[in-house]
Amino acid sequence: MNVFVDTSAFYAVMDADDEHHPAALPVWVDLLEGAHRLYTTSYVLVETLALLQSRIGMDCVRLFSADIQPLLQVFWVDEGTHRSAHHALLVAGRRDLSLVDCVSFEALRQLRLTEAFCFDAHFAEQGVQIMPEHLKGGIA
């Protein structure tokens, strides 16, 4: 199975104090043990590294870079994808929706992915099957 991984999931896996950590860890282990192909975007990587650096520190950034990043298939965002996502952001006109989210949705469409490991309700709004499934109604 091919699965998109969002910043919200990466952060929940990396930070034991995060409210979603208990739900994230078993999903992460299952994904790794199941030999699933894990996808993300270059924008999610930038967002994740910045978040880890500011909230946890550089040791966490190094750990993520050494142990998690090599496991990922990275969708490198080109100008066309950026423009499409930027347009989608402007059309949506919502303060709670980010450019990184819109880039992720565009990447999901281009990669024909239907499942995402995340704690972001915007993915479910896009018709994406999210993991952990039981959190569909209760994520931020």
Where are these regions (language model features)?
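A generic structural signal for short hydrophobic patches within well-formed alpha-helices
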Residues: 10, 45, 82, 123-124
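Acidic, PIN/NYN-like endoribonuclease modules and their adjacent C-terminal/linker elements
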Residues: 105, 110-140
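Hydrophobic residues within well-ordered alpha-helices
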Residues: 6, 48, 108-109
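Active-site neighborhoods of divalent-metal-dependent phosphate/nucleic-acid chemistry enzymes
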Residues: 74-115
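Helix-adjacent hinge/juxtasegments
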Residues: 50-52, 59-76
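Short active-site oxyanion
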Residues: 34-38, 71-73, 112-114
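Short, well-structured N-terminal submotif of metal-dependent ribonuclease cores
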Residues: 1-39, 53-63, 135-140
